[in-house]
């Protein structure tokens, strides 16, 4: 064996965005398969070059749907797509580095690379690093009892539960946590899953209901178990709110405030679906096992909000994905700059669910979990909050018919196009305008411009005008539907109206940025029509 060590990089062929990512890799001068040769001893310069190549490949491989769609238009000069993507890419690189090698020089090289990656993780741009402001007047007695119950039942934690200013209850690091440290570990026996239904007197009745899902079964079990004074999980149920305050509980005034927004449709559709399910289900539960006083619409909605806002999809050792409630873990708040991103699989060796941190979290800082790559409207509807900061997943979808063309470019395979705040784009030059390239190329195609080389675009500036005017007209109508901004005193309004107003203002900000970009783009194109480039 020579004193070399190869790291093999590959874009999986089953990646749902394989062709899009292949194109992005090509733009970086990379193929779908790359081999990185690490010599026995690397200088700092060569080590940095190796890490840069790994990062370029890793970032693209780990792009999600929204990040792929906005692609290079959202990439910073430093090559960063998003904080989420950067953390995922760096974690992916670490997973590629062998734990051991036969040659000492290889070991030294790999250790140097591993240290360089961990250093990058601790320096991720945009990551929140601030001490949590604890509200001392709120005594977390029930929460403390739950943690004690958890520890008595095998839970291991390096987190402290507290009331945090601006967040409600949250989890604070009780010691410095570095990359890979397990902040929280929960044994399977302390997780609420469908297994408890199968071992209850409910199951013989529920299994006879056509089409009932395991998720619905465990939800119905929870509605009754919550009132069981002898329940194993009583300390957990005692910590749950009487009202979850999600978008599903919005009152009439809040719903009226949402007129003209995308969120209004999302909430109304979700509530209608829940009501239909309840009306279909309850007549089938006329049995002493299901006391009517426990299965009211209000209790059903509460249970739905509990599972929407607190449950997690967990993969068990048998390979089955189950919807579970995880005591203690439910106190971890969401952030677009999370510490914990990989936590959905039970460890076979320990029969427990582990929550390792993917970036450092210092003692006294709030430890954040990623609930998923969700829009703010989804988080408000099902979780009851709006995330702090600019959420890159706040997109406005635009549906178009798929263009049927054998020679079509991969951009046109998008069946749903989208726009978001154009301040997130790094390119506002002509032919970009801060708007996503797939959408622009789709609209160019719709106006008869089949080829989109820079020469073609310069020769068809009238098409550019039409594309920008099309987008401008669409979003002018959206802005009109939102109406004028309210002058209501938010400090003295109900919680749901306050959230509705903030959500509407966020949508207004996004639409305003799109209109500004269209106006600036139209002006730019007009200038080049009058004074063509030489």
Q: Which role does the model predict for each range below?
A:
Residues 2-190, 195-198, 226-534:
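Long, positively charged leader/targeting segments at protein N-termini
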Residues 204-241:
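Conserved, structured regulatory domains from eukaryotic proteins
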Residues 196-197, 202-206:
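Juxtamembrane helix-loop transition sites at the ends of transmembrane segments
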